[in-house]
UniProtKB/Swiss-Prot annotation:
Sequence repeats lie at residues 76-77, 113-114, 225-226, 273-274, 303-304. Keywords: Acetylation, Isopeptide bond, Membrane, mRNA transport, Nuclear pore complex, Nucleus, Phosphoprotein, Protein transport, Repeat, Translocation, Transport, Ubl conjugation. Residues 335-468 form the RanBD1 domain. It comes from Homo sapiens (Human). The gene is NUP50. It comes from the Eukaryota. The modification N6-acetyllysine is found at residues 8, 83, 127, 450. This is Nuclear pore complex protein Nup50. SMART domains: RanBD. Residues 1-26, 122-148, 201-224, 238-269, 304-345 are annotated as: Disordered. Residues 304-317 have a biased composition (Polar residues). There is a cross-link at residue 353 (Glycyl lysine isopeptide (Lys-Gly) (interchain with G-Cter in SUMO2)). Ubiquitous. Highest levels in testis, peripheral blood leukocytes and fetal liver. The lineage of its organism: Eukaryota, Metazoa, Chordata, Craniata, Vertebrata.
Amino acid sequence: MAKRNAEKELTDRNWDQEDEAEEVGTFSMASEEVLKNRAIKKAKRRNVGFESDTGGAFKGFKGLVVPSGGGRFSGFGSGAGGKPLEGLSNGNNITSAPPFASAKAAADPKVAFGSLAANGPTTLVDKVSNPKTNGDSQQPSSSGLASSKACVGNAYHKQLAALNCSVRDWIVKHVNTNPLCDLTPIFKDYEKYLANIEQQHGNSGRNSESESNKVAAETQSPSLFGSTKLQQESTFLFHGNKTEDTPDKKMEVASEKKTDPSSLGATSASFNFGKKVDSSVLGSLSSVPLTGFSFSPGNSSLFGKDTTQSKPVSSPFPTKPLEGQAEGDSGECKGGDEEENDEPPKVVVTEVKEEDAFYSKKCKLFYKKDNEFKEKGIGTLHLKPTANQKTQLLVRADTNLGNILLNVLIPPNMPCTRTGKNNVLIVCVPNPPIDEKNATMPVTMLIRVKTSEDADELHKILLEKKDA
């Protein structure tokens, strides 16, 4: 919406004048009949969800979010979502059991787990024995059948059922309240009370319990994620649960592990909390060959069985002997490269020697042009006698060809002076000429030797030969 323009222009002439007072308007309320016909829009949030979905890396994952229906998990169960999680909820939120970590539970264990008397809590036993209280009257779950059979028995079964029901109700209550709670104290207390029950009733209760567990496992309905065989192999064993399987059951489990490997190429092992793992399980795990970043080569689906699994699969990476061999080959290649990449041979300069020279010295020759000295080249200075008893000054370049940089006769009137630290200055007509246009013009030449002693010696010889 555009701003309102100024009604009065402010200038240097009217800046001290007071503005006219404006009348303040009032709002008038519409009648109810008019308001009924109006469409009143209210602000609403576009994405209405749980508070846990507002942020975080796992905000899209809703498998552990507890809906307001009470005790039902949307991530498990049938597709309709009407069946509760088996073994964790009985359809009723029981709030009679206080938390394990409370001081009252530590002082009086009977309050947390119910009465530990021989008869047990009748309310919990009735709820467990009745399959209709498990949340689904038409399809009772296998855990309900197992608990009902466990409850119908001697006093050991009743106390064990009461203990399990109390643990289940406590877990369901507190997990629904806070899914991030720590359940470690539960199993420690469960271990303690289970040991007390077993001390009271001895081995008779354990033997009957193992038989009832076996019957319950046989009558268990198929699960949504796999067969009953996989569930039987991946059962949870808590620390302190001293149930002993019969030899026949051990033989059945061993034969199943040998003949029916897991669909993903590894032997399935049971989850053990605080209990020693059977050596047969470790042996079966160690017998599986390590494939190392490579999948099974058999033509099998994701959840199917692989017929070629027993064959060892070769790793895509080389082993240690191959690595050693590769290192040897690379060493040989490196040696060949080093031989090929040697430094290029240095150019050997064969100096052209003047046999009849009585004086030879390495020097650098300069010539003067435009009031500055320019380098002519590096070579060897030779002083040679001639037939007419004169001295020839010859400077050859240090190359294989031995190009002549300067070749003149020392005349008697040639200027020769000592300059600088190791320089000798002469004036002559250069041959070969420096400037072809002015070939007969004298040019100042500068001869630089290595040391000052060499310069003094050369200057002395030149003066002697010039005078001669």
